[in-house]
Amino acid sequence: MKTITFPVGYRPNYLLDFLHCLRKQNLEGWEIFCSVEASPQCIQLLEICDLKMNILHKPNSIGRQDHSGARANMYNALNSAFAAGSDFNLHLEDDFLLAPDAVDLANWYYENFKDKPLSYMSYGMFGFAPRGDDYTLLEEVPFFEGLGWCAFKENWEVCYQRAWWDESLAKKYYNAYGWDWNVQAYFRDSECKALRPLINRTQHNGRVGGTCCTPQHHDKHYAPLKWNQTERITEFKIIGVGGDTADRVK
């Protein structure tokens, strides 16, 4: 089973933009799991959307009484999908915009690596600044990018499920906190590799009211980025190794 997961918070305007993008994707053969905070407007949007989704309500017992927090909400979606039998998952967020071929890239990853899932630990959608003009190209990098990524069940069990709540390596390498820093530190400690497109297949849209991103940060680091808004690619090529951790912006 192939799955798509995403958390849902309290910003219906961004959720509506995201669902508009998601509905345009090639979703044949995919199950959708989303974990929802106690946001009536967002829950209503999901229920009236004509997508078949497993809508999970996140318990309020984690974090603040009225808000479980983004990390717990994401984990609930991911863990529920893999527990339900997912072999391969595309993880997105409710304040993303998606390229027309975002799920096509996920399908390509699945078809080309389903028999060797641990070739890479992350099969990514995003890489900050574009590197060239060829929409078909992918590159190998020695780090994790969190703005849209795919993982096989084996990747989930070996890396993400273990690292998600374990702060020890993030403190050791980065003196940082958060699920993505935990995963990044696991990549560094275990010398993991990832694939990512040279031109992004996701774009951050959540300028206001996010967990970490401020309007100033969004305007500086995300708004200027080139990402695929027009092309529909179904076949991709890996060109080699590129980038370094200097590409990453937090």
Model-derived features: where do they sit?
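Peripheral/terminal regions associated with large enzymatic or DNA-binding modules
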Residues: 1-92, 96-250
